[in-house]
Amino acid sequence: VKLETAIPPLLHQALQNLHIDALYSHQAKAIQKIREGKNVVMATPTASGKTLTYTLPVIESILETLESKALYIFPLKALEQDQLKALKEFTLPIKGQVKFPAAIYDGDTSSYRRRKIRESVPAILITNPDMLHLSLLPFHTQWEALFRNLRYVIIDELHTYKGIFGSHLAQVIRRMERICDFYGSRPQFVACSATIANPRSFAERLTGLPFEAIEESGAPRAGRNFLFLNPTGSPYTLAAKLFLDCLDNGFRTLAFTQARKITELLHTWILQDRPDLRGRVSSYRAGFLPEERREIEAKLVSGELLGVISTSALELGIDIGGLDVCILVGYPGTITATWQRGGRVGRTDRESLVALIAQPDALDQYFMRHPQDFFGRGFESAVVDPDNSVVVSRHLICASAEIPLRMEEEIIPLKNYGALLDQLVAEGELLRSASGKEWFSRRINPHRMVDIRSAGEGFTIFEEGTKRLIGKSNVPRVYNEGHPGAIYLHKADPYLVTQLDQGKKEVWVKQADVDYYTRALSEKETEILSVVRTQHLAQFTSCYGRLKVTERVRGFEKRRIFGQDLLSVHELEMPAHVFETMGLWIILPEGVSQRVKEEGLHFMGGIHAVEHASIALFPLFALCDRNDVGGICYPVHPQLEKPAIFIYDGYPGGVGLAEYGYGMLEELLKKTLSLIQDCPCLDGCPSCVHSPKCGSGNKPLDKRAAKFILEWLLGEKGPEKRGAEKIRKEPFPSSAAVLLPVDSEISDPRGDMAATRRPAWLKEEISRHRVLFLDIETQRSAEEVGGWQNKHLMRLAVAVIYDSLKGSFDVFKEDGVHDLIAKLKTAELIVGFNIADFDYNVLRGYSSFGFSTLKTFDILQQITSKLGYRLSLNHLAHKTLNMEKSANGLQSLQWFKEGKIGEVIAYCQKDVEITRDLFLFGLANGYLLFETKAGQRVRLPVEWDLSKIIKA
């Protein structure tokens, strides 16, 4: 389309040189609004030509007035380089006629170059928020030519300024506007964003200015194909194989991982498998030197590199040339980030492929089970709180050092911050003038004390001996990863923390060759300071308000890297991290706790699981990750005197996430219920209710109780309904076993036990042999004895045996353990579930007898050898027998400690019954039933023949 106002001849010449004869409709619309003096935010897809929409007006203004200046702000240095390159290419054909000086001013700019730039400020200055905060605003008198003539401020990748970074940038922008006002300029803002749900309101909250939004793109797009993969094995192994397959088929490929370590590991594995690709494949992540990053980017553009494995560092709009395939190793966390990363390939007229390889994580598995929701779901909203009191107070100090604060100011509304001003004066950070009308900073350069990318106090990490800088951390993260005894990972290398110096804000580490990692154990308390809003939803009440959160690291675990076995637990004395923030809380209705207990479920485990799962799904609605929000639950909160679940912003002062979550809480709980219902596990797993950051080691958790509680809260009937399941009739492929579909006639075995699962011939056959079905319960947990390798120290609480020859049960306590062992020696066959690895190892604490000599049939071993992975006894019982365990091991331990031996015996006997009936079902039918990750209920063929098993 054509612009309403003609383009100057020189610009027309520059466009023709780039073979641009016309503009897309969204470009023309945006340029027209910019020409009208309006602030504009563009939220159109990747590669839709957003850069051109601000390049034309900026250069047009320079042609009109040579003193005109523009400030370009990018979140990453690589984007700055990209922009400078694009500007040079655009202005090349008219370079001889008009000068368009542009320069980058960032941390990589030499001291000499910085001085030259300040002495002669270019028409276009390209920088980042950190440099604006630390180097431009504090020394604005040296940048008068920039701020007095500033016509445009360009903010690229607007959507990245969410959370605490966004709260800081909001204040940095207001400080910049204040300085511009001081010099008599009022710059116009142009922002570019990935597609988000709320570009206009987000831009307005970030800048405090009105905006016009351009959201509909007129640019053509090539076809994009999506492939969802949910591996039963390692997602990383599959990613490496797919990456190589793509390269071998001539497709240039980009793989995104979730962590630096995985990026480097994938790169290593690929080159180990294919050394011929060295120099044609590279990793890319933060932490690389600037010249290393630029070399990789240049090789991607030139085609020298066939593939790259990257963290999110390549997610943003760096020009990386034409690629064909994007492999997402794990769901990126948001729809916006997924499309942003997928948009890095197929950026010309070629079709592209985006392959999402799921990890055992709640969000990943949610979309694997609900792909229609992925494609039908709108983009998330970007959330920012410009009024975070902790952030505002720090920037008030910075602003007062730049230009004294005055109460009548409008850009920074001091009338709203009276309490903060009084507090800062009382703390000695601000000095009030004699007239009482102005405030000054006590410090000359307070900006150095403010890290705009974090909220807590900063700590520096050094290596012992060399005193080499290893990295940085902040409160509260430093208490979790920088405590004495912690293993700190840097570039995949392990370091042992030897000292945490609170006074100097230093952490000292030394290199360590260890086969374990550490995980902090913590405890939390939440105090309600004020209630801002209250609402009644479905069958519960929720509130939003100000909270005081107290977090304390009380110890840490050592876990083996391979297998994650618990090795040991260590206590710590660490200072509490206390902060005020904003949060929401759900007040559970009267009676729900009692009903959960009546169902034989664990109430605390249920609300704990609801808390974990709802936080895991929070990114479905807002741009964030699960580390941006925290949670805690109470069976009885001391202030409310009722059960409650809290979800709060994980940063002091709040960042707006809890407030946003409060507005969509019912929808969040519905999605949480769907996640828990659809996950095939029975007792909870990382795909539903486990949290990688749980300070109590994911204990207690009760998935069934969580489902019951959510159904109650949402107004559905409480107890789980049982009905015929709809089962797909096509087979589920597996390289480990042939999984046959279930016939509808026998898909849900019910009714008479003898008729359905124990035919007469089987009952008669097994009664002729002494087959003992064994299960034991212990007195101590693995944690209490220093890890699973110490099963022999767990001590016997109760053992139950079903004797097929007698047709009855025998119960043994610790004082009868030798009678138990003697009984086992009489058996023709002993059947159990995980008996070889667990039960026998517990009994080895009492006897040197060689239990491996006993004729044993371990059902779990049989299943693992077929599938390549484990299934729980409860899962098999539920899917095969329509039965469920009566409790769990944690509950049994608690009963024993409370002296409730009768409950322990009943629980143990129930497990023996389930084990027996699973074995008999397999003997009679030749299969067991289980449910796949995709929700398919299928057969697992078993070739069990009693006589052959006994004779083997």
Residue spans of the language-model regions?
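Helicase motor core with emphasis on the C-terminal RecA-like subdomain
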Residues: 1-18, 22-25, 29, 35-48, ...
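Acidic, low-complexity intrinsically disordered tails
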Residues: 711-762, 952
